[in-house]
Amino acid sequence: MAPSVKDQVEPQHAKILAIGTANPPNVYYQEDYPDFLFRVTKNEHRTDLREKFDRICEKSRTRKRYLYLTEEILKANPCIYTYGAPSLDVRQDMLNPEVPKLGQEAALKAIKEWGQPISKITHLIFCTASCVDMPGADFQLVKLLGLNPSVTRTMIYEAGCYAGATVLRLAKDFAENNEGARVLVVCAEITTVFFHGLTDTHLDILVGQALFADGASAVIVGANPEPEIESPLFEIVACRQTIIPNSEHGVVANIREMGFNYYLSGEVPKFVGGNVVDFLTKTFEKVDGKNKDWNSLFFSVHPGGPAIVDQVEEQLGLKEGKLRATRHVLSEYGNMGAPSVHFILDEMRKKSIEEGKATTGEGLEWGVVIGIGPGLTVETAVLRSEFITC
């Protein structure tokens, strides 16, 4: 006998049920990093480049970062720090096992917070731009965690920094359209593939060396959380992706024998600032058709660099402190790519509890995740916070 309408559960928006983060053990303080970089790449005699790099580091507003690479690894593999040297095989041999392991560390933290048996995970989304192999990092994570071999897997390669919001969109679709689904989302980046020695002909490398960092995030997403068992953190209400016109040269990365050869245009902050009001307005039209007071929202903005964060703040007319969680992650972790926006949400909900706020979103009801990456692609996710009951 089919259940009556009364017995059927009213479908809900997908919710983030847990967040976990992880970093490699090696901490690099920004004040010491120039000495390290110029020493290991054997460029201590390049005082001109050193002065430029010192200025970039001083303006980065990054205090420390975590990296897989060590001086010992670099000394044993000089092809990694010799600009242009064929080194892709060496890099991938390192990263193909290490990226899933870092993702596993974040996933175990999220699963522990979630508090449910791992057998309840029905879907897995794995996102990385650091390694490419078949079978992929998603397959390796299934083995590392002991997930059901029939878990539904989705692998996202080479999307870049906007993908932290992309995976929330996919997880929302899976959770809301598959009854009882519990989606484990993992983003893991180890930027060894982007590490290069220094050269006069490609100064973009100096910017990457000052900002890029390693980290992994995991979130568990599901609709209709079980009362008294699952504790939602944020509701994923609506998502939207768009390409900023005429900006594809802004962030470019090409896989070459030397690793990822990347290009970072100084126009990126201008592109983001010139379009942020438009794409946020259109994103919130999907929610209630009304423009929001931007200062009434909480924000998780991809920390691609201080100028990008400043432009978002300026163009939206945000009050001081509105991007506190974003700036904290930029300062304490650097730009970790896709995981960054999840680190920001984790920092925000923890700080909200610590400060006695009413909700996980700094005491506010509505908020937005803004992912920014190659394309330039902007991916947004409208979130609704949950009341803090503990």
From Swiss-Prot:
Transmembrane segments: none annotated. Induction: Not regulated by elicitor. The active site is at residue 161. Type III polyketide synthase involved preferentially in the biosynthesis of 4-hydroxycoumarin from salicoyl-CoA. Can also use benzoyl-CoA and malonyl-CoA to produce 3,5-dihydroxybiphenyl as a major product and benzoyldiacetic acid lactone as a minor side product. Can also use m-hydroxybenzoyl-CoA as substrate, producing m-hydroxybenzoyl diacetic acid lactone as a derailment product. No activity with p-hydroxybenzoyl-CoA, CoA-linked cinnamic acids or acetyl-CoA. One of its GO terms (molecular function) is biphenyl synthase activity. Its EC number is 2.3.1.208. Belongs to the thiolase-like superfamily. Chalcone/stilbene synthases family. Optimum pH is 6.5-7.0. Pfam families: Chal_sti_synt_C, Chal_sti_synt_N. InterPro entries: Chalcone/stilbene_synt_C, Chalcone/stilbene_synt_N, Polyketide_synthase_type-III, Thiolase-like. Homodimer. This is 4-hydroxycoumarin synthase 1.
